[in-house]
């Protein structure tokens, strides 16, 4: 069995972008961490590029100073990397995640992360991303090194 309950023998590689996007959503939308705990929305999926967003909740996502908690920002950054890996057919785990915090966002506002692959190797993927507030002001620069641990055989490396 492959991730997402796919049997290797029964897998046909998808070719239409809308089918690939639907399959990636099918894999990640039911993810309890992304959907139930944080309510992360997958806004856009393209080959090697993903945008996710989060409507921040002042009751759940702030720290003792009543500003957006840095851990929430890191969780959103880490979540986009898995979806970005899947967009090129890779099942990935985080090896290193670096975030340069630039500014915070208003609690109750929507924040968004736009990612893109800068290196797609045989065993690793490097993903760069930027986090923005709802006024399109840069909040953080992100760099992630991901290890490829498996592949989604139905999702092509390029599409």
Spans of model-derived segments:
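Terminal targeting signals and extreme-terminal segments of soluble enzymes
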Residues: 1-159
């Amino acid at each position: 069995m492959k991730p997402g309950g796919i049997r290797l023998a029964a897998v046909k590689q998808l070719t239409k972008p809308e089918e690939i996007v639907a399959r990636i959503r099918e894999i990640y939308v039911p993810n309890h961490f992304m959907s139930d705990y944080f309510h992360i929305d997958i806004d856009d999926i393209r080959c090697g590029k993903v945008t996710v967003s989060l409507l921040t909740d002042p009751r759940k996502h702030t720290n003792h100073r009543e500003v957006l908690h840095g851990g929430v920002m890191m969780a959103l950054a880490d979540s986009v990397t898995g979806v970005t890996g899947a967009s090129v057919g890779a099942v990935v785990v985080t090896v290193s995640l670096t975030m340069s915090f630039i500014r915070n966002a208003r609690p109750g506002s929507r924040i968004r992360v736009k990612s893109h692959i800068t290196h797609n190797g045989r065993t690793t993927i490097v993903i760069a991303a930027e986090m923005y507030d709802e006024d399109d002001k840069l909040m953080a620069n992100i760099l992630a090194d991901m290890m490829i641990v498996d592949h989604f055989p139905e999702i092509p490396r390029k599409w």
